[in-house]
């Protein structure tokens, strides 16, 4: 069934997601903070809106929120570069506008950083012990949205995002050394991010939480060295033996949606 969908934040994930949903027959609106991106969205037949979300409100054309069946909040926190930023208050503003516009279904893109450095196999029922500023604020955002009776929210806790132009190895290879060599990777490819969201859209959105991590967990040392060789990058220099051995499980989503991951080996060529 065709839906009227708004993608709030047409960035690295939001833009290709909006393109895919449009090709799937949905009516798609997309927001950006960049004026230069508006014409690009328009050229792709995505209805464009210039919007800027801050802790104090949302500036721009609020017509973006009109008559939406579903909104996907895909705004990256970007708290590493701006640790004083109040992403949680930004999402609070989004919540208010969604209520004002009678939006009933929300998908919120969160992160596995909400688990902090917990060890073991982590499920959606695991304790949340975020250590980073981003992780702490994302927990607040999740609680804010799922406890709003005016709409239903599905939270997607994405692992580390990778794609053709994005991979942790590009940064790891620049570091003097990288710790936790025997820890497990918990990543997900852009293709699977989009397909998981599409699977959700084809059903009624309900209050729920899903981990979204490819069920492929080699050691960091083995995986990043192999991918570096494959991509022609400098290998990361691993140091230390202290291991945070965690494995984020996506079994719940796989079970509920009979989902099969598309990029099974995280770009590793067998």
Regions found by a protein language model. Name each.
Residues 5-9:
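Conserved N-terminal Rossmann-fold NAD(P)-binding element of oxidoreductases
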Residues 141-164:
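Conserved beta-loop-beta element that borders a ligand/cofactor-binding pocket
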Residues 157-158, 167-170, 177-201:
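Substrate-positioning beta->alpha
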Residues 93-131:
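Conserved Rossmann-fold NAD(P)-dependent oxidoreductase catalytic core, especially the SDR/UDP-sugar
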Residues 196-250:
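Mid/C-terminal beta-alpha module of Rossmann-like enzyme folds, strongest
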Residues 66-107:
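NAD(P)-cofactor binding segment of oxidoreductase domains
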């Amino acid at each position: 069934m065709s839906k009227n969908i708004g993608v709030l934040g047409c960035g690295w994930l939001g833009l290709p997601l909006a393109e895919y949903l449009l090709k799937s027959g949905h009516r798609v609106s997309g927001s950006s903070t960049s004026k230069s991106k508006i014409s690009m969205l328009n050229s792709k037949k995505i209805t464009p809106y210039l919007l800027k979300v801050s802790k104090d409100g949302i500036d721009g054309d609020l017509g973006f929120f009109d008559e939406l069946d579903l909104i996907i909040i895909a705004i990256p926190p970007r708290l590493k570069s701006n640790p004083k930023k109040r992403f949680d208050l930004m999402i609070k503003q989004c919540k208010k506008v969604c209520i004002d516009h009678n939006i009933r279904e929300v998908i919120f893109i969160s992160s596995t950083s909400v688990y902090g450095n917990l060890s073991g196999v982590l499920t959606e029922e695991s304790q949340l012990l975020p250590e980073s500023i981003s992780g702490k604020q994302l927990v607040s955002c999740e609680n804010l949205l799922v406890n709003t009776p005016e709409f239903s929210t599905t939270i997607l806790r994405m692992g580390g995002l990778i794609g053709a132009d994005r991979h942790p190895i590009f940064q790891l290879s620049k570091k003097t050394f990288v710790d936790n060599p025997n820890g497990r990777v918990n990543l997900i490819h852009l293709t699977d991010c989009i397909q998981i969201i599409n699977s959700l859209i084809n059903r009624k959105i309900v209050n729920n939480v899903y981990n979204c991590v490819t069920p492929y967990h080699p050691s960091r040392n083995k995986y990043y060295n192999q991918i570096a060789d494959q991509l022609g990058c400098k290998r990361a220099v691993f140091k230390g033996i202290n291991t945070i051995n965690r494995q984020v499980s996506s079994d719940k989503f796989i079970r509920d949606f009979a989902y099969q991951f598309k990029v099974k080996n995280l770009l590793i060529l067998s």
